[in-house]
């Protein structure tokens, strides 16, 4: 009935459907429909991304603030329970441990029951996807709810697990961007553009960082450094615009909720502006960078080794395969027991939240000098005005608690990374770096109590500046990024230590990048995700290794003059996704590519003719409409390994055919590239 059309009685106009003819107010309905069509064309104008990026930033800011609000309520409820439960050590211990155990067990079980890809940080998988690998359902919108709920429960455990939300928020932002992109393409009816989709995903990663730290500049640079090996400068504006929208709304919500008087940085500092550091201190900042680089190598090696052990050990692997919540509960119980404040947690400042950890470590006064003549009390309740008291113990001193904190959190964080739940690992690493810098700064303050004399003027040493440099250097070394220096400035709102912090970050990266893969690359290796390693150094001979030395020679070509019987045999006996199409069996000149699925469909739709004296060949199938793809890019047999690797990374390629004088002679994929690079960096032993 709805397909029938007619004319209104006494009306000579365009035909209308019966449903419209009988519907109420047809003129108003047509006007509204026309207005919506006009609005759709304006909002979703082809090539216009402003609305998309602004929507992405605003949505992620709302999600981030709502999560922080909900997490804050749960954390305050836990603190209230711990305070009001009484003086019984058993009840206090149970309230401190059972609460996070229940939250983590629910987080692990809930997220894993919906989709296993919602666990962990999410950045390693995103790096793999942006490199051109397709991971099924990883950006599905159902993962969004699982990750939000699981991450909220993880962060609600407070300082017992000591985890952050940067990585998961990058994943959440990318999922929202992918969903909005699908809505956009469906609404305007344009075909999906893979290149543009990747550009939007990198911009979404910047939004994820910006809505956590309210740091748009470092968010953009960090996402570029972590997510992609090559980035087009013309796409900068997308990341900056979306990240600025997200960071602005995120901080504006805090002002509207009376949490802040105006839009300011997250972590307040009071560093001297006139003379923040003396010139000789540059040497100590560079030395701090070297220390952070060495410690980051140790951390990366231990973390990757322990994660591999957990995945391969007979007992832990079986527990993770069958009862992930049980493994999560056991690991959380151990970590929560260690951080119990009346016990070992007394020496770990475990009553401080992660924000309070950074607020105290960035203090510009020297705790060691302040405790030389007097011992501050350890209060029954946390004193927000004297957070540094949590770091002091009369027997351990400031140096003992800082060193103990570093040693314990070093392995506790490694253990926490094995728990299968949504969690971020950047913020704990940032705090560990701040503790390393604070320890060195306190040692220098004791060694030079009056400061270092330069030009007859003495200025006391500020340990908080070293904590800032250590946080940027250690986190930058672990993630192989330089933008952590800018992140430190945006977090604190001060740039007085710009040069020493940047020098420390560069020194740490120089050591870490030459010795270990980054935290995210190491996770990719352990999870056995598709991964194309970098070629490090100039003297390993990558310019002398040619494609013909490592390419796959056994390729199956289809010539235009191949009989259909042979084509059917090739299709049924191989499982490749595409075949190189050559001009003839004799010449082997590469002229195109035929997709296997389309070729099978064409063969099924057009059965071979049984006319006598006529033998059908592949050319007949192609002439009837079987689509072929032009060969836009190939490798020459004389192409070097270095050039091939750069080409694969630049264009996010998975495989390329190799030609010699136009003839198809082989193909190169990630498998051959990885094997060639591995043989180059670690030559096999001579037989």
Swiss-Prot record:
Domain CBS residue range list: 551-609, 626-684
PROSITE patterns from the entry?
Answer: CBS (PS51371)
Q: What superkingdom heads the lineage?
A: Eukaryota
The chain's Cytoplasmic topological domains, given as residue ranges, are 507-687
What the record says about activity regulation is: Activated by extracellular Ca(2+) and inhibited by extracellular acidic pH.
Q: Which reaction does it catalyse?
A: chloride(in) = chloride(out); bromide(in) = bromide(out); nitrate(in) = nitrate(out); iodide(out) = iodide(in)
Q: Which family does it belong to?
A: Belongs to the chloride channel (TC 2.A.49) family. CLCNKA subfamily.
Q: Which PANTHER family match?
A: CHLORIDE CHANNEL PROTEIN 2, CHLORIDE CHANNEL PROTEIN CLC-KA
What the protein does comes down to: Anion-selective channel permeable to small monovalent anions with ion selectivity for chloride > bromide > nitrate > iodide. Forms a homodimeric channel where each subunit has its own ion conduction pathway. May conduct double-barreled currents controlled by two types of gates, two fast gates that control each subunit independently and a slow common gate that opens and shuts off both subunits simultaneously. Assembles with the regulatory subunit BSND/Barttin for sorting at the basolateral plasma membrane domain and functional switch to the ion conducting state.
According to the UniProt entry, which disease involves this protein? Bartter syndrome 4B, neonatal, with sensorineural deafness: A digenic form of Bartter syndrome, an autosomal recessive disorder characterized by impaired salt reabsorption in the thick ascending loop of Henle with pronounced salt wasting, hypokalemic metabolic alkalosis, and varying degrees of hypercalciuria. BARTS4B is associated with sensorineural deafness.
Q: What is this protein called?
A: Chloride channel protein ClC-Ka
* UniProt organism field: Homo sapiens (Human)
